[in-house]
């Protein structure tokens, strides 16, 4: 992969009932980024989401449910001819503790239905993922109710700190300095 990020998408489910849930931490990331850059996210039906242009890159918060996130990502990417390798997807990560945030280049979906759908719609898994840790409930049968509920106050504070850490590295992501971002986040 080469070049910098031209599309940043933050995954989550639409609606107030999901806004504060663990599954929406990718959307938290994107909303905070838009606020920090003084960008208003405007609803764009053709892109199935809320969109803003921020200098040389696009912000996208899908209005689809998590499992259909690929519709939004692919619509915007195809329209603006953005390659998968120029896309960053911010999403919740069960396999990391709350407070961890890591950058991953390509790979599978790891059981994440939003990523699975994006891979399907793009026809590629060669995009970057900003994996925001939310902890694991301990057993796979508890995953759905867990991700669809708000985090504890301590976890929320840790998640917000991780988001801030990731936001500080947006300039490097846009410039394509992925190795620096990985060094910063993974150490």
UniProtKB/Swiss-Prot annotation:
Task: Reply yes or no: does the keyword Chaperone apply.
Answer: no
**Superkingdom as given in the UniProt entry:** Bacteria
Q: Which chain positions carry the site (Discriminates between blocked and unblocked aminoacyl-tRNA)?
A: 13
Which amino acid positions bind tRNA, per UniProt?
Answer: 18, 65, 67, 113
Positions bearing the site annotation: Stabilizes the basic form of H active site to accept a proton = 92
Residues annotated as the enzyme's active site: 23
Known catalytic reactions: an N-acyl-L-alpha-aminoacyl-tRNA + H2O = an N-acyl-L-amino acid + a tRNA + H(+)
User: Where, per UniProt, does this protein localize?
Assistant: Cytoplasm
Pfam families, sorted: Pept_tRNA_hydro (PF01195)
The record's listing under Gene3D superfamilies reads:
Peptidyl-tRNA hydrolase
Report keywords, A-Z. Cytoplasm, Hydrolase, RNA-binding, tRNA-binding
Protein's UniProt keywords contain Amino-acid biosynthesis: no
Q: Which GO terms describe its molecular function?
A: peptidyl-tRNA hydrolase activity; tRNA binding
Its Enzyme Commission number(s) read 3.1.1.29
Listed under GO cellular component are: cytoplasm
Question: What does the entry give for GO biological process?
Answer: protein quality control for misfolded or incompletely synthesized proteins; rescue of stalled ribosome
Give the record's subunit note.
Answer: Monomer.
| UniProt record similarity statement | Belongs to the PTH family.
Q: What does this protein do?
A: Hydrolyzes ribosome-free peptidyl-tRNAs (with 1 or more amino acids incorporated), which drop off the ribosome during protein synthesis, or as a result of ribosome stalling.
| Listed NCBIfam families | pth (TIGR00447)
Protein name, UniProt field = Peptidyl-tRNA hydrolase
Native organism: Coxiella burnetii (strain RSA 493 / Nine Mile phase I)
Task: State the gene name recorded for this protein.
Answer: pth
